[in-house]
């Protein structure tokens, strides 16, 4: 399975970066300001008595955040630093935070807007935490940041307009410290930084192919180039494309996935080390701690530790590994009896599962023998160990891992996906029977936790006097209403770039949308009519 590849000599010449209309993004001088940018002295909205609706000091931590709002007219997005709005986007704009994948920190944000004088009728700019423009570019650009290198990607232009569905365009790499553009090989449309190497996916459209026709041999017309920052190429793979390892990319920062076409409908997935040249075929996925799984020639599966010198084999399986946490692997088997199994790496015991669900830090497994367990993904510690009393003729289950050892279960005794019983379990066993909520709410979703770590939920119900409208109630772990009548509410994942405090969610109440705590206090809010492009359309946010 292991192959060591021949590396291209350092004397090879790479193509120079072309800052032209067809294959690059021309840097423009900084603009004078951001249209629609908020003043540093933004006023806090007040209630009828003149009392501020929120204390801006609560979120005054200097971190970039983004508040998304949606309504019938489309989307509107606000970029904030701490609790200070920097920019409220028009509906024709695209704005987003730019996270450095190496640090997980976002110190910049990107904005693109309509401009008839720009390439494809669009322009793009990068801004810092103060709202000051750092760089601007022709065209509609997407951006990623990797170890201080800004990677820009632009869709293909045809007759002055973008054709994003073609899947190929151009890319550019800029060193933010110096503003210098790094060499990019001809045909490059994406770039991934692996260690000190740049991995480019490239494509050449066949001559004579109509601009709007699909390239039926696109797999054969792609290739991958790995090169040094100075442009020296060190490796090339034909009929291939490269993909960053999005999960556990810090531990395996020198590795990249290569998909190499071996036939008209067959592809080899390869885990490639840009520093050593090692290649492992049959690659499936990576797991925490630098582990990876592979398929073998005899139809089995291997789990290997890619951080060790010999890439040590941990275990071999008959079924495909789905998830890993210390001491265990979740496997998936297909066919008529498809489903999950919990594999004990120490004993080799396999336990059939009804369902499995993972949060950022825990993984919950509900076994067909009735046992319900929640483990820590960090160390494999057992957080919850209880037994579920099944409903009569139980056929399936819907499970939601609420974190901290809590699990929401919907038990079904039919094949129509109708729920028979709804229960909440935790470290102490059964917490509450919430079956009665089924008659009141069209659906109930996990929202956040209360200050004691117990889960809270958001239930959607019909608004009084409305045939189609809905309102939302916030419920505690016992199903009691804590907040009612919200126009919207939605949770945030703990790994969100917004980095909000605990026990906070996005909500709309009345004519304001923003972030609220479980006591109903705003941490930040803005009028749903505050955007110049809102057209007086009600919105909801997250």
Protein language model regions, located:
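C-terminal motif of bacterial Sec signal peptides marking the signal peptidase cleavage site
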Residues: 20-24
């Amino acid at each position: 399975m292991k192959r060591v590849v021949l590396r291209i000599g350092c004397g090879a010449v790479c193509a120079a970066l072309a800052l032209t209309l067809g294959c690059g993004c021309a840097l423009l001088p900084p603009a004078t300001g951001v249209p629609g940018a908020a003043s540093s002295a933004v006023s806090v909205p007040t209630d009828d008595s003149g009392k501020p609706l929120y204390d801006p000091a609560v979120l005054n931590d200097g971190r970039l955040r983004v508040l998304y709002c949606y309504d019938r007219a489309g989307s509107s997005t606000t970029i904030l630093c701490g609790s200070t709005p920097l920019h409220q986007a028009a509906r024709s704009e695209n704005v987003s935070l730019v996270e450095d994948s190496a640090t997980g920190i976002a110190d910049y944000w990107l904005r693109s807007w309509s401009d008839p004088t720009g390439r494809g009728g669009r322009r793009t700019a990068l801004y810092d935490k103060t709202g000051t423009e750092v760089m601007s570019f022709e065209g509609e650009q997407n951006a990623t940041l990797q170890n201080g290198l800004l990677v820009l990607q632009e869709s293909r232009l045809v007759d002055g307009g973008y054709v994003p569905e073609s899947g190929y365009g151009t890319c550019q790499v800029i060193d933010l410290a110096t503003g210098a553009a790094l060499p990019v090989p001809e045909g490059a449309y994406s770039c991934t930084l692996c260690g000190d190497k740049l991995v480019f996916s490239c494509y050449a459209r066949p001559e004579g192919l109509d601009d709007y026709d699909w390239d039926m041999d696109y797999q054969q017309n792609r290739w991958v180039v790995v090169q040094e920052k100075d442009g020296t190429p060190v490796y090339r793979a034909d009929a291939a494309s490269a993909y960053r390892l999005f999960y556990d990319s810090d531990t395996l920062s020198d590795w990249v996935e290569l998909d190499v076409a071996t036939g008209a409908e067959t592809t080899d997935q390869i885990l490639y080390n840009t520093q050593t040249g090692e290649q492992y075929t049959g690659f499936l996925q990576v797991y925490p701690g630098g582990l990876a799984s592979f398929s073998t020639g005899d139809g089995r599966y291997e789990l290997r530790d890619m951080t060790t010198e010999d890439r040590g084999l941990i275990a071999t399986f008959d079924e495909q590994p789905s998830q890993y946490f210390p001491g265990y692997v979740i496997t998936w088997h297909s066919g008529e009896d498809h489903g999950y199994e919990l594999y004990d790496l120490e004993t080799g015991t396999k336990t059939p599962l009804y369902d499995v669900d993972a949060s950022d830090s825990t993984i919950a497994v509900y076994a067909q023998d009735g046992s319900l367990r929640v483990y820590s993904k960090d160390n494999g510690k057992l957080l919850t160990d209880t037994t579920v009393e099944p409903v009569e003729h139980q056929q399936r289950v819907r499970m939601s891992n609420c974190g901290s050892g809590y699990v929401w279960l919907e038990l079904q005794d039919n094949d129509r996906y109708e729920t028979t019983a709804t229960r909440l379990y935790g470290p102490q066993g059964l917490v509450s029977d919430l079956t009665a909520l089924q008659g009141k709410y069209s659906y109930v979703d996990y929202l956040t936790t209360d200050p004691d770590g117990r889960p809270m939920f958001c239930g959607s119900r019909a608004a009084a006097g409305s045939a189609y409208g809905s309102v939302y109630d916030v419920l505690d772990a016992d199903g009691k209403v804590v907040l009612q009548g919200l126009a919207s509410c939605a949770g945030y994942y703990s790994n969100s770039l917004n980095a909000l405090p605990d026990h906070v969610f996005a909500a709309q109440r009345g004519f304001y949308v923003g972030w609220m705590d479980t006591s109903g206090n705003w941490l930040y809010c803005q009028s749903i009519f505050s955007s110049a492009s809102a057209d007086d359309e009600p919105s909801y946010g997250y």
